[in-house]
Amino acid sequence: MLPQPQIWLCPTDRPLIPGYQALLSSEEMARGERYQRPQDKQRFLTMRLALRILLARQLDCLPQQLQFTYGPQGKPELVDRERRSPWFNVAHSGNYGLIGLSTEGEIGVDLQIMLPKPHYLKLAKRFFAPQEVQQLESLEGEKRTKLFYQLWTAKEAFLKATGKGISGGLNQVIPDENLAKYQYLPDSGDTNHWRLSSQPLLADQGSNDNYWMAIAWCTNEVNQVESNYLPNIQPFQWPRNLDSLP
């Protein structure tokens, strides 16, 4: 059985665990203070706390013992990463965040709240491949909105996994028409070793809004994941207090 990524869904509008400051670094606290809007600060602190707690559970250590370093585009990684340490990635939009962990290789997650905006085609013409623009032009209304976010999240998930961000070339990351795998990738990716899962955030997962998520992960195996594979989305469970942490 091929190891599959683990995905957690975390609401970002809930009260923070009392005493949370003890789990974060001074750099993280300072970064949180730089946000102008309270909801942005809340979102950042929530996701960084959740990430630390999940990684600490995996590595059997205290959350505050983890140290992070950052790539050229800001992608966080663990300092002195050990062989047993998972790869990870974080995304957030609206009132929700996603955390993805993988023991096989790099992983990227993206989450977007689907808001109808008039400039989708303008963005697509700038960042998407010509055939994708044609697909969008053939649709209207909700169908166009949905396809835009399906394509955008699939592209960004891969670029986040590789640590390149949007500058890595959105128009060079092309998912297949079923959003089950990648049809074409830049030089940094072999389509035979990258998996893609694209799905909505369902109402029974707690959302009253329309969200779309994508997960991209690298594997050493080839063609061993079903084309319709959807990772299990687990609700993140907050500890009741600091004393209940490992």
From Swiss-Prot:
GO BP terms, alphabetized: fatty acid biosynthetic process; lysine biosynthetic process via aminoadipic acid
GO cellular component: cytosol
CC cofactor: Mg(2+)
GO molecular-function term, one example from the UniProt record: magnesium ion binding
Alphabetized InterPro entries for the sequence: 4-PPantetheinyl_Trfase_dom, 4-PPantetheinyl_Trfase_dom_sf, AASDHPPT_N, P-Pant_transferase_sf, Ppantetheine-prot_Trfase_dom
Coiled coil start-end: none
Residues engaged in binding Mg(2+): D110, E156
EC number: 2.7.8.-
Keywords carried by this UniProt record: Magnesium, Metal-binding, Transferase
Broad class of enzyme this protein falls into: transferase
Function in brief: Probably transfers the 4'-phosphopantetheine moiety from coenzyme A (CoA) to a serine residue of a carrier protein domain.
Family, similarity comment: Belongs to the P-Pant transferase superfamily. Gsp/Sfp/HetI/AcpT family.
Descriptive protein name: Putative 4'-phosphopantetheinyl transferase slr0495
